[in-house]
Regions:
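Peripheral membrane interaction modules
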Residues: 2-15, 80-199, 223, 229-291
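Short, contiguous, pocket-lining structural segments
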Residues: 216
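Short Lys/Arg-enriched alpha/beta "domain-start" segment
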Residues: 6-90
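Extracellular glycan-recognition regions
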Residues: 213
């Protein structure tokens, strides 16, 4: 990870990593990614399930992994774009205290503009014949295929990271609390040819924050309210202003029960560690400028 040095002291924010630097712009821009993290427990052992959907010129891809809190991979299944014809399958692995199984069926999946399927699929993770995570709308097919008990279906959605694209307007959808409503997020920022660019963020068409004098405030954080919950918004647009035209800015929306606490914010820490300690849900957006 490479963090930009903060220019806001203790209240500053560091949310950029190597994937958001201009040096890796080509790699990030060439592929559209969405990664979701789910926290769960296997026999009292806290684990993280990661589901990554990708879309490139070669086609769709899917990666599912199960890690423990130390970062050790317990089980992983990869469906590469050039192997996506294998749209149905499973993978299992015996671990120290049980057996992890991953099932998927994408044979009838329908995709929209993004890398995630919108319907006609399922992805399931099973531990010792207990269904832990189930994604998709084909639930009956998943129940029949896995033959698993549903009592452990308790994985908590803790983080989402995605890549979004635009010229000056960038859009995404987000759900900030479990079973809460989806919200439309719009980030607007025009940095080309302007002496004093401005950043504005809207939620459900309502302006919730505006940053002027962006050349001096290219990194920062601000608290907004969504669904009555405090959501801390972090931004890093340094690469838009001072990097290459192909680089991306990073935005993070983080819910926290105790937002007044001063936390050592780091993009990788938030995405991978802090939510596992009960510090809320995180949405990380990599916003790429299109020419």
């Amino acid at each position: 990870m490479r963090d930009f040095p903060s220019c806001f002291g203790e209240s500053g924010v560091q949310i950029a990593d190597a994937s958001s630097s201009s040096s890796s712009a080509g790699k990030g821009a060439a592929q559209n990614l969405v990664t979701c993290l789910y926290q769960t427990q296997f026999s009292g052992r806290a684990c993280v399930i990661s589901v990554t959907w990708s879309k490139s010129l070669m086609g769709q891809g899917l990666s599912i992994g199960v890690d423990d809190l130390s970062g050790q991979c317990l089980c992983k299944a990869d469906i590469k774009p050039w192997l996506f014809s294998k749209k149905k399958g499973s993978k299992s692995l015996d671990v120290e205290d049980g057996k992890i199984e991953i099932f998927w069926d994408l044979s009838g999946a329908k995709f929209g503009a993004g890398p995630e399927p919108v319907e006609g699929f399922y992805v399931a993770v099973v531990f010792d014949l207990e269904l832990v995570l189930l994604l998709g709308d084909m639930k009956k097919d998943a129940y029949r295929k896995t033959g698993a008990n549903r009592s452990m279906l308790n994985a908590a959605f803790v983080a989402r990271r995605e890549h979004i694209y635009g010229k000056k307007v960038y859009s995404a959808k987000a759900q900030f609390c479990d079973k809460g409503q989806f919200h439309d997020i719009v980030i607007e920022c025009d940095t080309i040819g302007l002496k004093d660019p401005c950043l504005e963020i809207r939620v459900d068409k309502k302006p919730v924050m505006q940053v002027k004098r962006l050349a001096w405030k290219f990194r920062g954080n601000h608290t907004i309210l969504v669904d009555g919950l405090p959501v801390e918004v972090f931004w890093d647009v340094h690469s838009w202003l001072f990097g290459s035209t192909a680089s991306n800015a990073v935005f993070m929306f983080h819910t926290c029960q105790a937002p007044e606490k001063s936390l050592p914010w780091s993009y990788s820490q938030i995405f991978r560690e802090s939510q596992l300690q009960g510090l809320g849900f995180s949405l990380i957006l990599h916003a790429w400028k299109l020419e």
